[in-house]
Amino acid sequence: MSQSPRFVTRRGGSLKAAPGAGTRRNESQDYLLMDELGDDGYPQLPLPPYGYYPSFRGNENRLTHRRQTILREKGRRLANRGPAYMFNDHSTSLSIEEERFLDAAEYGNIPVVRKMLEECHSLNVNCVDYMGQNALQLAVANEHLEITELLLKKENLSRVGDALLLAISKGYVRIVEAILNHPAFAEGKRLATSPSQSELQQDDFYAYDEDGTRFSHDVTPIILAAHCQEYEIVHTLLRKGARIERPHDYFCKCTECSQKQKHDSFSHSRSRINAYKGLASPAYLSLSSEDPVMTALELSNELAVLANIEKEFKNDYRKLSMQCKDFVVGLLDLCRNTEEVEAILNGDAETRQPGDFGRPNLSRLKLAIKYEVKKFVAHPNCQQQLLSIWYENLSGLRQQTMAVKFLVVLAVAIGLPFLALIYWCAPCSKMGKILRGPFMKFVAHAASFTIFLGLLVMNAADRFEGTKLLPNETSTDNARQLFRMKTSCFSWMEMLIISWVIGMIWAECKEIWTQGPKEYLFELWNMLDFGMLAIFAASFIARFMAFWHASKAQSIIDANDTLKDLTKVTLGDNVKYYNLARIKWDPTDPQIISEGLYAIAVVLSFSRIAYILPANESFGPLQISLGRTVKDIFKFMVIFIMVFVAFMIGMFNLYSYYIGAKQNEAFTTVEESFKTLFWAIFGLSEVKSVVINYNHKFIENIGYVLYGVYNVTMVIVLLNMLIAMINSSFQEIEDDADVEWKFARAKLWFSYFEEGRTLPVPFNLVPSPKSLLYLLLKFKKWMCELIQGQKQGFQEDAEMNKRNEEKKFGISGSHEDLSKFSLDKNQLAHNKQSSTRSSEDYHLNSFSNPPRQYQKIMKRLIKRYVLQAQIDKESDEVNEGELKEIKQDISSLRYELLEEKSQNTEDLAELIRKLGERLSLEPKLEESRR
């Protein structure tokens, strides 16, 4: 009995083609398909069943030749199976059976793959094409889930790890889940194994060919999923126990790091970057950390530090650091109420001590300011929260006009002594709470500093129209008084200035104690304060030394009653000096040094006004631009000093032999060379500075050339370069002025959020009752700890003495103590074991303990962030990803329909055969009846 032939397509059309060539490839495949079918869609020639291929080899070769001919005629290249020019390896040539198998796996021919896996027992499922890809990799690359599931059921399947990486890179979630269900991932160790580690195990789990996988050797599945921002895949891998190990410190000298650095330093650096790319991925940050805000902030700072260390990868690390900062800003942007904003800014408040006076501690915001996450600090949600804290206990003042606020500031400045008295007497009263508010503290300190500047101005007011005493004159109040006693003594105005300076020194000491020396020196404004106060202190000390020496001389005169008029007697040298006019003083006189230092300190004091300028929207950006300009000037000074010193020494060497032989003293000494070249920058030096009175034209011409080159280099080149740098910095500030200003204002505000510094200078010198109470409480706590420590020490000594006595009398009689000791030892071991177990189960506490409020809020925010990221990704890939998926579905459906059609053809042929047999039997039955 004959059987209807079954039609099998060798290689069907695929819509998963190279970009831009999909239509042509489909047309060629459809053309070949119609060659095997008749006009009515039925097979022209009978084909043998599966597993019987030798008789069909000639037809296969003919079809392959025709396919290649058609493709060449269409003007495109097709990556054919078998040897190629670049990959000509005859030892791995494929049989017709293997080629058919790989074709079916690549183009989604599910029926062919299923039947070949079931019926072809000699089939090598790990056979590879000319590119070294096996059937599993081809099926995964073309998103054929059903074929992938069929192949994963086979034992000894190779390249499973590479197939997983490929599925992750393409974002095929269902295929990733199918591969993760493979027995190779049952223990989870494979998820933490990179291709390089797999090579050490000498297996083909990740093997691609002799050159390695298509992915980097140090990339694990979780790292690749994080790189590709595949949130669902990252979540799946994290549930399987996969984690990204943080790289060791850059300067780590452990054995592992030393070997990697010695073996291949470039590969070691790239592996670090790949790991940090995974750690800085928003997908990994949002799904792996219990506190993603804290993790992202610390990681951004770590990456910024690495950018300054590894200069060759600076751009990569900076990009990753900015990615972490953008992640934090994205979370803050998704907040919908004040509770969520406070959770991000404060962190886990339940595990931390509350802020001062019930004020939020803003621990995360402190970290953001420290790491200069400017967009986070300048975000409207953050600024609104800061503004509410800034006007604490003065909410009505927030909506007032600028005129009303100015009147409040003026009233505080005038009534500052009375407000300080109220706070001393009743620090916990309503007025005391208002004075502890950040805004009132800022106003009080600003008013105090303004008064200090006013004192500096008033101290010099008596000399505005010129001094009444010339430098060569002396003046005294009586005949027995030395002139220096009148000039070196401190006036009442200077005593007020000294009290302000002492108060500021005390405030800085408290700040150093609170912040620590490292944090204190990190702020540049603190360095300015330190320099200003140090110069003031040095000036006053020098002034006091001058007054002390003058007082000693005056005491000698006061002890001698015979000296009635100092102008009519001859004084000793040790006394006479202190009665001389100013022009006869020594250059190193303490009073002269004091006056010079005082002038510098006054300049620095007025420059300190720039600290409070960020509080104003108009002056804040200007102050920021000024600060950036100062930084540019310091950078410029390196090149400037190098060029300046070169010409200064050169011109000095040229003219140092002509002292007295020039029209002026320029360049004859190092000092004159410095003055001449410095003022030449501003066009204030004369050309005749290089002229010699004698006929030494060679030296003079060289001087002209060097002086001209100096002016061209300094004035035309370097100064214009400095102007360009300043202009560029100003433009950067101007382009992002709002963010820069809000960040600077937040730093200013934050300095007044901390506890303390309520009373401004100089009222802070008087200790308040609250400060005395806190001091007594701290002293009491310290004494209790000291006494408790002594008691514990006495108990330990007593136990030690008891044990020593037991050893003397023998241990046999103390079985109870031994049993107690053994029980204590067992209890200690149990405690150690339980503590170890608790540390290992730290990440599982969320399952056993109820989640805290902070965890609930972060969970909500992370959900919103992930959903928003998925929506953005889908909108970006709507034209590309969905189209590819549709193509693959159509391709698989096509083969299924062809298989169903072939099966229906067989059934129809069987029915026709049976019908023919019945029709042929009917005449015979009629004849037999007759």
Swiss-Prot record:
Gene3D superfamilies from the UniProt entry: 1.10.287.70, Ankyrin repeat-containing domain
PROSITE patterns noted in UniProt: ANK_REP_REGION (PS50297), ANK_REPEAT (PS50088)
GO BP terms: cellular response to hydrogen peroxide; cellular response to hypoxia; negative regulation of dendrite morphogenesis; neuron differentiation; positive regulation of calcium ion transport; positive regulation of cytosolic calcium ion concentration; positive regulation of neuron differentiation
Ranges of the Cytoplasmic topological domain: 1-437, 508-520, 613-635, 727-930
Modified residues (Phosphoserine): 814
Cellular compartment(s): Cell membrane
Chain residue ranges for the region called Disordered: 1-27
InterPro entries: Ankyrin_rpt, Ankyrin_rpt-contain_sf, Ion_trans_dom, TRP_dom, TRPC6_channel, TRPC_channel
Keyword Ubl conjugation: no
Pfam families: Ank_2 (PF12796), Ion_trans (PF00520), TRP_2 (PF08344)
Role of this protein: Forms a receptor-activated non-selective calcium permeant cation channel. Probably is operated by a phosphatidylinositol second messenger system activated by receptor tyrosine kinases or G-protein coupled receptors. Activated by diacylglycerol (DAG) in a membrane-delimited fashion, independently of protein kinase C. Seems not to be activated by intracellular calcium store depletion.
Family affiliation: Belongs to the transient receptor (TC 1.A.4) family. STrpC subfamily. TRPC6 sub-subfamily.
Name of the protein this chain belongs to: Short transient receptor potential channel 6
Gene: Trpc6
